[in-house]
Design a protein with these regions (language model features):
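NAD(P)+-binding Rossmann beta1-loop-alpha1 motif at the extreme N-terminus of oxidoreductases
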Residues: 1-49, 102
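Rossmann-fold dinucleotide-binding core
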Residues: 107-189
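Amphipathic alpha-helical segments at domain termini/boundaries
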Residues: 19-26, 57-80, 165-173, 179-184
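Structural motif
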Residues: 9, 17, 66, 84, ...
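Short beta-alpha connecting loops at secondary-structure transitions
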Residues: 31-36, 148-152, 182, 200
Length: 209
């Protein structure tokens, strides 16, 4: 599997960050949102971002923009479709329905959710669709945070998951780890626990802020 073309759906902080980082890796990417104007504003934010999301700002126009009503046909040519919309399960399910009707056979579909279980996200997908569906949880800001969690489901083609992991490590420079579908995945699960331990110890020691 070769990833030569990516579509990111959702141009908020995470979606635009993912699109920018793909652009940094010279991977053709299209950023879609409800309206083209929203995607265009996201591209402007990428161009003006501090710290910069782009290594070379002259590449900004390599990020194509569009909307999910008029430009959804771009999905059919994508090797990887990343969903990065608001954390509402009903909206994500609607997006997946559109994606799986439009995508080419074998194209990877992933969600950037930070906490919704993959079992919930994929509950309306067929076993064949689940084979190509996973979670790719990037951390913010995408360019500077090294960790990437890839959460698999029980139907995944593990060879394809490993190829995606390799792409993200080699082409995107990420420290990619494959996780099971557990609450908080790995990063948030460990991070929240560490913060709670720190707060508990601070209370015990009667530390002030």
């Amino acid at each position: 599997m070769k990833i030569k073309n990516v579509v990111v759906i959702g141009s908020g902080t995470m979606g635009s960050g993912i699109a920018a980082h793909l652009c940094n890796a010279n991977v053709p990417v299209t950023l879609l949102d409800l309206k083209t104007e929203i995607s265009e504003k996201a591209r402007e934010r990428i161009h003006k971002s501090r710290p910069p999301l782009l290594i070379d700002k002259s590449k900004i126009n390599n990020i194509k923009v569009g909307n999910i009503s008029d430009d959804f046909d771009v999905v059919k040519d994508a090797d990887w479709i990343v969903e990065a919309v608001v954390e509402r399960i009903d909206i994500k399910h609607q997006i997946y329905d559109k994606i799986f009707k439009a995508r080419k056979d074998g194209a990877i579909v992933s969600s950037n959710t930070s906490s919704i279980p993959i079992k919930v996200l994929s509950e309306h997908l067929s076993d064949i669709e689940k084979k190509d569906f996973c979670i790719t949880h990037f951390f913010n800001p995408v360019r500077y945070m090294g960790l990437l969690e890839i959460v698999k489901n029980e139907n995944n083609d593990l060879n394809k998951i490993n190829q995606l992991k390799e792409f993200c490590e080699i082409e995107l420079g990420k420290g990619a780890i494959v996780c099971n579908d557990t609450p908080g995945f790995l990063g948030n699960r460990v991070g929240v626990y560490a913060m709670q331990v720190a707060m508990t110890e601070a209370f015990k020691m009667k530390l002030s802020i």
